[in-house]
Every structure is written in structure tokens, then in C-alpha cells.
Regions:
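Extracytoplasmic/secreted envelope proteins and their assembly/folding machinery
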Residues: 64-67, 74, 78-81, 121, ...
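A short, structured surface patch at a secondary-structure boundary
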Residues: 69-123
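Binding-cleft/active-site segments that stabilize strongly anionic ligands or cofactors
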Residues: 102-157, 205, 211-212, 217-286
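Extracytoplasmic
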Residues: 44, 56-58, 65-68, 75, ...
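Extracytoplasmic substrate-binding proteins
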Residues: 141-213
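Bacterial Sec-exported substrate-binding components of ABC uptake systems
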Residues: 4-7, 20-76, 180-208
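Solvent-exposed, acidic/flexible segments
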Residues: 71-74, 117, 135-138, 159-166, ...
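Bacterial Sec-type N-terminal signal peptides, specifically the leucine/valine-rich hydrophobic h-region
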Residues: 14-17
Length: 286
């Protein structure tokens, strides 16, 4: 009897443990399923961001969240996407590029979509992007590209400032992938660096120039080099001139007459691989 009682008790204990194990397993499995469902509910399929339309007006644009297929026809956007670590999602890029982004041009898996000035619409369509990034040079193609996929058109605003504009654009792009914290980390020191440069620039005059097609152009505070006169604070001696694109051509005599303490030059020819840069250096690089 005692042996039988022990056997029965052992059997009951075993059954109890098995039942507990099954209950715990069921609970764990149920919890995992619930967590996955909750994550799916929390991760949206689409989000809305602030972008520009063909006229450069700010609009609310619906884009896919965490897109897997991206077409890029803007170097600034490509730079941001590359820095965010989502370059593997790029299925097509402009043939126009910078040396440190050339992997996206030389990569056989990335389709050639034309240039940052003229998109190959057929090539864009063939790579089946979920979203397309463009810059100002392709604003005229905005509507045609929008028929293929949502078009994210971002730019810099001189009034806002180059650094703040770039940061804002990076935050916008990052929000499409849930990578906002990455942008905060990468831009954390921008303001401090600008403050240091601004202190050095106080009371000093400068000319801001660009070599392009063999000529030397002077830039105002409304162009792509506005960071020097607006945010850093050098007294740009041609600040009032309207020079939003490539600036106004200037002679060597003009530079001498202005007599700046500093001259900042952006070599556009070298940046885009044009041959004309040699002449610009010969004439103004002494």
C-alpha cells in the first residue's frame, strides 16, 4: 500500500508538473504572439512627412515607412541615406555622383537613372521604387516621377540656414526608417562648431567664390555657400548680390578692388569632374 501510495503521489506530481509546463508554454507562446501583433500595429505601413511639390511649395506627403526599394536622384539625399546605413535599399541612382558616393554608381545592382538634371523615366519605372528622392534640378520632372512613386523633394533654405536645413532634411528622411536618434547623434556637435567658427569670423571681411567652367564667380549670401556669410558670420563683401545659383562672374581686378581679408573658393569643376577647373586655378589660384 505504501509503495502504491508513493507511486500514485509521484504520478500526480508528474502530471501536475506537466500541466504547469504546458500552461507556461501556452502563456509564453501567447505572449510572443501578442508582442508581435502589437509591434505590427505600432509599425505603420505609411507615414506623412513635409516635402516640396513641383513649385517648391511645402506639402504633406504620404510615403511608405521603412521602404525596401529607393530611387535617388539627389546627391544630398544620397549622402544622408548612406550615413543612415540604409544604402542597401537603394535600387537606382543618378550617374552624377561624388567620389565618396561612387559605390552607388559603380554597383551593378544599382540601376542608372540618368543624371540629377535629367532623369531617365523609363529606367526609374523599371527599378520599381517605393519612393523617389529628387533635388531642385529635377523639379520640372516632379509630376512625371510622382506617377511612378511618391517623390520626396527636399532643399536648403537660406533664411533657415544651411546647417539647420540639412539637419531638418536628415530628420525627415530618418523618420521614414525610424532612425531619428541616428541623426541626433551625427549632428550633435554642429551648433558648437558653428559657434567656434562664428567667434573667429567676427569683424573679418571675406569674398565667397566658385570656379565653374573655367571662370571665377562671386557668391552673395543667398546661394549654396551662404553658410559662410549667414551662419558663420563673415562680412561677405558681395552679400547683397543676387547669386542663388552659380554666382556672378568676376575679374581678378574686382577681387583686388574688394580687398577681402579672406577668400573662400568652392571648386565646382573639380567636384563634378569638369575639365574647366584647370583654367580657374591658373587664373585665380595664385
Amino acid at each position: 500500500m505504501r509503495k502504491l501510495a508513493k507511486v500514485l503521489l509521484a504520478g500526480v506530481a508528474a502530471l501536475s508538473l506537466t500541466a504547469c509546463g504546458q500552461a507556461e508554454g501556452t502563456t509564453g507562446s501567447s505572449a510572443d504572439t501578442t508582442a508581435k501583433e502589437q509591434k505590427q500595429q505600432e509599425t505603420p505601413e505609411k507615414i506623412k512627412i513635409q516635402s516640396l511639390n513641383a513649385n517648391g511649395e511645402e506639402i504633406s506627403l504620404e510615403v511608405p515607412y521603412d521602404p525596401e526599394r529607393i530611387a535617388v536622384l539627389d546627391m544630398a539625399a544620397l549622402d544622408i541615406l548612406d550615413n543612415l546605413g540604409v544604402g542597401d535599399k537603394i535600387v537606382g541612382s543618378a550617374s552624377t555622383s561624388l567620389e565618396y558616393l561612387s559605390d552607388y554608381v559603380d554597383n551593378e545592382k544599382v540601376a542608372n537613372l540618368g543624371t540629377i538634371k535629367e532623369a531617365d523615366l523609363e529606367a526609374v519605372m523599371e527599378c520599381e521604387p517605393e519612393v523617389i528622392f529628387i533635388g531642385g534640378r529635377l523639379a520640372s520632372s516632379y509630376d512625371a516621377l510622382s506617377e511612378i512613386a511618391p517623390v520626396v523633394y527636399l532643399s536648403t533654405d537660406v533664411e533657415t540656414g544651411v546647417v539647420k536645413s540639412v539637419t531638418k532634411n536628415a530628420e525627415t528622411i530618418a523618420s521614414m526608417f525610424g532612425l531619428e536618434d541616428e541623426v541626433k547623434e551625427k549632428t550633435a556637435g554642429f551648433d558648437e562648431r558653428i559657434e567656434v567658427l562664428a567667434e573667429k569670423a567676427k569683424g573679418h571681411t571675406a569674398l565667397v567664390g566658385m570656379t565653374t567652367s573655367g571662370s571665377f564667380n562671386l557668391m552673395g549670401n543667398d546661394g549654396r555657400c551662404s553658410i559662410i556669410g549667414v551662419e558663420i558670420g563673415f562680412d561677405n563683401l558681395t552679400a547683397a548680390e543676387s547669386t542663388s545659383t552659380h554666382g556672378n562672374e568676376a575679374s581678378f581686378e574686382t577681387v583686388v578692388e574688394k580687398n577681402p581679408e579672406y577668400i573662400f573658393v568652392m571648386d565646382r569643376d573639380q567636384a563634378i569632374g569638369a575639365d574647366g577647373g584647370t583654367d580657374g586655378k591658373r587664373n585665380y589660384g595664385k
